[in-house]
């Protein structure tokens, strides 16, 4: 079979959620971010696993994502939508009982006129300049917005992956200035904010990347293994090139495995002649260019060529691969292609 297998450990995701939950006080609720199809790992199954672990609030990017998660979970858990109440979202918000995080005065007006009485939250801009009501806007609308009974006041940290960055304290101060005394539950922290400490936790945290094994949660359990099938093996003589543009040439007689995955499957071309795959625990260098559907790997040192080689797993996390590619683990995870066969179960040692 020429289809790669992406193994996703739901128990590890649940364990990561519990570990992050235990870092906060008992009166602080821990939500879960399942946007972008749970960072590419399958929101329906991931949300079920997190609900079993105890999560009761889920966060998605769009109302369409929220509808998918509601179909998977049924009634009960709250599903919050970061993009708020966009034009055309009214029916989805109503029919799937979604809670939009309203980001602007236009969105407040739209929501109150179309769905007065429907739950909502408010996103405030504490300095990231991306989404949310700015301090001046919030001052103008806070009175009637709070009177309408928001479920949550939230903001988002720009630099929480760097605990020493001064922006963290600046945003904390700005958020408190806008929300102290409101009596409404507050949320400022995703994974990085949880790790900053209790001052950033408030009444609700909303971890995302930490659930899926990513930085900055260094103690996270590995969540994914990506095993790529070997299609063909050949002997390459000294001086013979491999792959497009002859970017790699054999310096000695080499055994080269051609493996079924490429940039169409989310493996960036920047991995060309830089990445490492694994046969069990044995590293094998990627040689030549990453092409659309194929990569080539030097397996000369293996006593026997296996049926598959791993590019993600316990020996190489998405963050490790991202370092090699010059990107971030988020991008590696969310780019994992549709051609992979997704399997849910424990990661083999």
Curated annotation (Swiss-Prot):
Keyword Protein transport among record annotations: no
Reactions accelerated catalytically: L-alanine = D-alanine
Cofactor(s) this protein cannot do without: pyridoxal 5'-phosphate
GO MF terms, alphabetically ordered: alanine racemase activity; pyridoxal phosphate binding
Top-level taxon of the source organism: Bacteria
Alphabetical list of InterPro entries matching this protein: Ala_racemase, Ala_racemase/Decarboxylase_C, Ala_racemase_C, Ala_racemase_N, PLP-binding_barrel
Pathway this chain belongs to: Amino-acid biosynthesis; D-alanine biosynthesis; D-alanine from L-alanine: step 1/1
UniProt: substrate binding residues: 130, 292
Keyword annotations of the record: Isomerase, Pyridoxal phosphate
One of the record's GO cellular component terms: cytosol
Enzyme class name: isomerase
Catalytic residues identified in the record: 35 (proton acceptor), 244 (proton acceptor)
BP term (GO), one: D-alanine biosynthetic process
EC number, as in UniProt: 5.1.1.1
PANTHER family: ALANINE RACEMASE, ALANINE RACEMASE, CATABOLIC-RELATED
Protein family according to the UniProt entry: Belongs to the alanine racemase family.
Record's protein name: Alanine racemase
